[in-house]
Swiss-Prot record:
Keyword DNA-binding assigned: yes
Coiled coil: none
GO cellular-component term (any): cytosol
Name of the coding gene: hns
Region (Disordered): 106-134
GO MF terms, alphabetically ordered: bent DNA binding; DNA-binding transcription repressor activity; minor groove of adenine-thymine-rich DNA binding; protein dimerization activity; structural constituent of chromatin; transcription cis-regulatory region binding
Keyword Repressor: yes
Family classification: Belongs to the histone-like protein H-NS family.
Subcellular location: Cytoplasm, Nucleoid
Protein name as catalogued: DNA-binding protein H-NS homolog
Length: 134
């Protein structure tokens, strides 16, 4: 898509592309491009009109609220806020295995994820996982 945009916005690229087309093909492409641009303009105009109408409605509601003596806080009390269900974090799993790493530090492992290198080396040498249980 970037290549197409670059080609359409660069005059030299357009000239090179048009050289390879017949006049009829170039005019056909021009008509289609103009149609697409007109559709884009109409779409943009609709969006601007909808936003303008929305702002007018909001201004009308604000004026009506002021006329009736209603405050935004009162509306907030009535409508409240949307409650977003936040998924609670899972509690960390307790450690099941203890080992001493290459630096001589005492470490623990929950049993999930990749097996720590010292435990894996011991398992490769014939030890059992139960040898490391806490």
């Amino acid at each position: 898509m970037n290549e197409l945009v670059r080609g359409l916005t660069n005059l030299r690229s357009l000239r090179a592309a048009v050289r390879e087309l017949t006049l009829e093909q170039a005019e056909n492409a021009l008509e289609k491009l103009q149609t697409a641009i007109e559709e884009k303009r109409a779409n943009e105009a609709e969006l601007i009109k909808a936003e303008t109408e929305r702002k007018e409605r909001l201004a009308k509601y604000k004026e009506l609220m002021e006329k009736e003596g209603i405050t935004p806080e009162e509306l907030h009390e009535i409508f409240g806020t949307k409650t977003v269900s936040i998924r609670a974090k899972r509690a960390p799993r307790p450690a099941k295995y203890a080992f001493i790493d290459e630096n001589g530090e005492h470490k623990t492992w929950t049993g999930q994820g990749r097996t720590p290198r010292p435990i894996q080396n011991a398992l490769n040498k014939g030890k059992s996982l139960s040898d490391f249980e806490i």
